[in-house]
């Protein structure tokens, strides 16, 4: 079954064939598109954790897009000792620890060349209500955009990643020797090799700009904070949300919901120094959305960079490119910190 699934992916990846990776299989899987689903309810109650490993599909892989088609884990609970909300059940992907409800969210994970992606589900509550279905898509980039490890000393016996997609062994046995023959250098074989080792056009469209943890490619849509449907956002989160757009465009953000902490307890929105201090102070409230080159649509004189507090619902913000939002939360948590919901639209700049 595994070989058949791999062959289907190789021959017809453009039609979206996906293969399923099992929990705690003990080995990594090297496939272009992978589905991760939760075990059955009976098995969930017996598991303390669930671990997955995904090996790079090719040497050109630089990113993996993770679509959380369904992700519902227990809501964070208050730690009596620290008085902070903490995830009991969670999924850990690099620096991200997610719990609660995150259906429809996505993440981009940036990888160094040859790096294996690891996903770890902690299931301490043994809840039968935990459910997830994730689709992982490996994205191949142009060679100069593939991140190299910080230190990569040469080793004669170091494992080598495939430089050509694994379709070649099949083709070499099926196609005439005039293509894969000894005298085919510079001919059809070289052209085919170049095609197979180049990133797919679909990959280039999916590729997120460097530093983006979420990437929205459509000209309009909605953006919400993690665990927005469940209640509160988590402490100590920092990530960048990017939207595709050209130099001649502008973006509007209509705020449907906005509830972040603020330096003082006064009700209403906060800007800049209300949200972020240039001097790091322990215990200071510092949750914010950072939106560069932005202003409030009905008051163009108001041009903050940091937004926090509450009372912004119904407002519209306008920003020029690059279209990026930085979200940051501090170590403190409160049940009033329910996050944000924005509707964005990219249009021709006036």
Model-identified regions with their sequence ranges:
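Domain-level representation of secreted and single-pass membrane ectodomains enriched
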Residues: 2-350
């Amino acid at each position: 079954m595994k070989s058949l699934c791999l062959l289907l992916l190789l021959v017809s990846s453009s039609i979206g064939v996906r293969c399923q990776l099992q929990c705690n299989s003990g080995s990594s899987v090297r496939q272009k598109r992978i589905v991760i689903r939760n075990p059955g309810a009976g098995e969930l109650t017996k598991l303390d954790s669930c671990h997955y490993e995904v090996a790079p599909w090719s040497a050109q892989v630089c990113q993996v897009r993770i679509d959380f088609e369904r992700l519902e884990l227990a809501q964070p609970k208050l730690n009596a000792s620290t008085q902070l909300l903490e995830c009991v059940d969670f999924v850990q992907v690099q620096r991200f620890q997610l719990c609660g409800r995150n259906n429809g969210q996505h993440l981009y994970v940036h990888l160094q060349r040859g790096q294996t992606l690891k996903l770890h589900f902690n299931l301490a509550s043994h809840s039968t209500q935990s459910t997830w279905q994730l689709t992982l898509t490996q994205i191949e980039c142009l060679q100069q955009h593939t991140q190299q490890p910080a230190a990569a000393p040469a080793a004669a016996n170091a494992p080598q990643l495939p430089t050509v997609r694994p379709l070649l062994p099949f083709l070499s046995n099926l196609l005439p020797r005039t293509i894969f023959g000894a005298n085919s250098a510079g001919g059809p074989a070289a052209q085919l090799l170049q095609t197979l080792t180049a990133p797919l056009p679909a990959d280039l469209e999916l590729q997120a700009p460097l530093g983006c943890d979420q990437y929205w490619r459509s000209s309009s849509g909605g953006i919400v904070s993690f665990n927005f449907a469940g209640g509160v956002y988590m402490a100590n989160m920092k990530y960048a949300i990017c939207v595709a757009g050209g130099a001649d465009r502008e973006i509007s953000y209509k705020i449907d919901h906005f509830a972040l902490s603020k330096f003082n307890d006064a009700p209403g929105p906060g800007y800049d120094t209300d949200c972020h201090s240039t001097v790091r102070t322990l215990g200071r409230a510092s949750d914010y959305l950072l939106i560069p080159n932005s202003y409030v649509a009905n008051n163009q004189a108001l041009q903050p960079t940091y937004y926090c507090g509450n009372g912004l619902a119904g407002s519209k913000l306008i920003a020029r490119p690059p279209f990026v939002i930085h979200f940051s939360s501090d170590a403190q948590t409160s049940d009033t910190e329910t996050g944000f919901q924005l509707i964005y639209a990219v249009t021709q700049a006036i």
